[in-house]
Amino acid sequence: MFRTGNSGWLAIAMIAATCLLTASVGWAQAQQRDTFQVNYFSNANNKEGIDETVRIINPGADAPTFPPSSLCAMIYVFDNEQELKECCGCLISTDGLAELSLDKNLVSNPFDGRSPTNGDIKIVSAAANDNFGGVPCDPTGGGIGSNGKYVLNIVPTVDLRSWGTHVQNDRKLTEDEYQTATLSTGELDSLQEECYGIVSVGSGAGICGEGVGNSSTVCN
């Protein structure tokens, strides 16, 4: 009977541990999903002059610290051939709103001089990392360190929410919320490395905001 009792308690303990582990993993995955947002853009720089707008807010609702801190919107703009064209970081204070013009801020300074008409925008909600020319948000994740390896110091942090308008083919303007997706380590590393790759060889090109070296200016 003693052995049977021990076995029973052991089984209960194992089940409880499994439940806790599952809950912990689920929470971590939810946190990662809530830090990565994606959307498309279409018909940029159209002859009618109808622009699209990206709006990003920092509600402070799910912030891991109190009082809630400012967060970086790390922005990566791709064309429809999966090539990164521009990247930038924008510091947004709690309850703050950033409004970015697609034509003027996000596709006007491609690293290769070819502005995309259609593509997608990826936004990582992250803690400030203060390495991009002395401003708080570095979308390259610190670039390459003295050891010759990528620093990769972006820390995804929950809270930012984003919306975007879209110019449809009939030139009607629609708006929707950015969709959340799970941010894998591989994707996060790739975004930082690709961003560093284009801004390090672009001589000012490849940075969002009409060539302004300080990308936080986009949001002021």
Feature annotation, model-predicted:
Residues V25-N220:
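Gly/Pro-rich, tryptophan- and cysteine-flecked surface segments typical
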